[in-house]
Amino acid sequence: MLGCRGCHGKDLEGTFFTKNEPQYGPLYASNLTVEIPEYTDAQLDGIIRQGVHPERKTVWGMPSEIFQHLSDPDFDALVAYLRTLKPAGKKLPNPQFSVQDRKDIASGNYKPAAQLVRERANQLPVDLGAGHALGRYITEVTCAECHGPKLEGNPNDPVGRIPNLIVVGGYSRDQFETLATRGVPVGGRKLNPMMVSVALGRLSHMTPHERDALYAYLKARAEQPQ
């Protein structure tokens, strides 16, 4: 599910996204079970891959900067799945911006999805050839959301230090499997809770072939001259 449940909730019925951050919003991740039927496939493409809403025009919080790289078959499969959801719960309110939100927007710290799509369109992980195409693609549409478009990390992220994925060079395939499926890094050290959530909620649900490809790409990337 490409992490949809991380914001939209385990049942995709939406969440009060800023519930524990009263300085923001209130901002809600929409209830996909009731909103998906309201849009055509083309409109969903605009929202998900382009960051453009057919009514509100501007989309906030959607990681369209990475979803713009979704292949057409994967996008079609995602939409086909979303259209199988039975409506449940209620439609949630549109975004409402607090004073802090508006300050962040004015300073450029909080950007609309369409702007991020434009800014990051050509910022991609290094191309290591056809043999690593699948692994690179997976990083573009998953890892890049937190680790950045070139997977270089962010030592100053508010949620905690996010490393350059060159660190995977220090993992064996078995160690990477433990990290990806159980959220346990080399040495058993404490991992950022966000990464534990990503491992258990996303990476562990990939096929072994996909994790093989992801590891092979990240390992090869780590072995490139720095």
What are these regions (language model features)?
Residues 1, 104-139, 226:
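Electrostatic cytochrome c docking/interface patches
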Residues 50, 61-63, 94-95, 116-120, ...:
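Interaction-mediating elements
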Residues 54-57, 145-146, 153-157, 185-192, ...:
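Substrate-binding/catalytic groove segments of enzymes
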Residues 42-49, 53, 66-92, 174-179, ...:
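C-terminal capping alpha-helices of c-type cytochrome domains
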Residues 7-12, 90, 185-190:
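Proline-centered turn/helix-capping motifs that create local helix->coil transitions or kinks
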Residues 1-5, 132-144, 153-163, 205-209, ...:
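Sequence context surrounding c-type heme c attachment/ligation sites in exported
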Residues 1-10, 44, 78, 135, ...:
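The canonical Cys-X-X-Cys-His
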Residues 9-45, 59-71, 99-107, 148-178, ...:
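Gly/Gly-Pro-rich "capping" loops immediately C-terminal to redox-active cysteine motifs
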